[in-house]
Amino acid sequence: MIAIGLEGSANKLGVGIMLHPDNGNPPQVLANIRHTYVSPPGEGFLPKDTARHHRAWVVKLVKKALKEAHVSVQDVDCICFTKGPGMGAPLQSVAVAARMLSLLWGKELVGVNHCVGHIEMGRLITGSTNPVVLYVSGGNTQVIAYSSQRYRIFGETLDIAVGNCLDRFARTLHISNDPAPGYNIEQLAKKGKQLVDLPYTVKGMDCSFSGILAAVDGLATTYGLGGEGKDDETDTPIPDADGNGKPTRADLCFSLQETIFSMLVETTERAMAHVGSKEVLIVGGVGCNERLQEMMGIMARDRGGSVHATDERFCIDNGIMIAQAGLLAYSTGFRTPLKDSTCTQRFRTDDVFVKWRD
């Protein structure tokens, strides 16, 4: 079976083509193409602008993916698309494209939960069997484990997502959004040397990131580190009246990462203890962060476990993860009728019946 997957829940538009061989061989990635809407430094991406980007690029990416995969329309069994969660206008743009292809080509639709797509692609690439999943992105922060044909959420953010926290601080510092604000925060954090005290908010299995964002934004304003015209290469401590070094932009990025990642490690470890798992799978765009992987690895090794993560091809939003999860659902008989192919911005991970797993 072959599926085309369309992803566009945020600023990244992805088209992927996945093959599940009939002979039982492992699935094959035939094409995985992505195009990102990049907004100016200091700005986020508005839904209407992002949707316009997706509409302009989706047909080009589908054509390119088919060419790269060396498959024809006749070879495709189904069209998979992100049903949610995500931003309304971008989601709707991609859903309309999926409906158009379904009607033009006479192929069936499969609506896919974005979070489940991340999990299934992570499981496929890393070979992890039944891990505790840390799903961290710009719109979601969840600690997940599988049970009774559901991906159960054991903990999550109480307010904003961890990726949103990083992205919004990047706006405060006017850090470039190319290739991604979180990635540029990570690179700047590597130069940080001073750990600044920031709010640490873990409530049971849940985290809160709005308070730490407000605190670090306030420090950036207090020390005059926000706004345009800052040179990262000359980001050096400025002595205060007592001769102590005031934090630099790099110090604030470093401190923000260390604090929020410590919160994520704590809640993930608690979930591992609860379900008796020795594996952690990190998925979502923030999962590319090497420091997060390092900190999670230290915790897992102390417990005699292991950490699994993918590179940016599969961690960051992509179409191939939608094709993978869609094919798994399609193989169990799941279809999305045209009348039900609307989008759900708050489509919960645990709303999905995972029929393809025991």
Swiss-Prot record:
Keywords: Activator, Acyltransferase, Cytoplasm, Metal-binding, Nucleus, Transcription, Transcription regulation, Transferase, tRNA processing. Gene3D superfamilies: 3.30.420.40. GO terms for molecular function: chromatin DNA binding; metal ion binding; N(6)-L-threonylcarbamoyladenine synthase activity; nucleotidase activity. SUPFAM superfamilies: Actin-like ATPase domain. GO terms for cellular component: chromatin; cytoplasm; EKC/KEOPS complex; nucleus. Transmembrane segments: none annotated. Its main location: cytoplasm. GO terms for biological process: positive regulation of transcription by RNA polymerase II; telomere maintenance via recombination; tRNA threonylcarbamoyladenosine modification. A divalent metal cation binds at residues 114, 118, 135, 317. Binds 1 divalent metal cation per subunit. The keyword Glycosyltransferase does not apply. Its cofactor is a divalent metal cation. The keyword Zinc-finger does not apply. It catalyses: L-threonylcarbamoyladenylate + adenosine(37) in tRNA = N(6)-L-threonylcarbamoyladenosine(37) in tRNA + AMP + H(+). Pfam families: TsaD. Its EC number is 2.3.1.234. Component of the EKC/KEOPS complex that is required for the formation of a threonylcarbamoyl group on adenosine at position 37 (t(6)A37) in tRNAs that read codons beginning with adenine. The complex is probably involved in the transfer of the threonylcarbamoyl moiety of threonylcarbamoyl-AMP (TC-AMP) to the N6 group of A37. Kae1 likely plays a direct catalytic role in this reaction, but requires other protein(s) of the complex to fulfill this activity. The EKC/KEOPS complex also promotes both telomere uncapping and telomere elongation. Component of the EKC/KEOPS complex composed of at least bud32, cgi121, gon7, kae1 and pcc1; the whole complex dimerizes. Belongs to the KAE1 / TsaD family. This is tRNA N6-adenosine threonylcarbamoyltransferase. It comes from Aspergillus oryzae (strain ATCC 42149 / RIB 40). The gene is kae1.
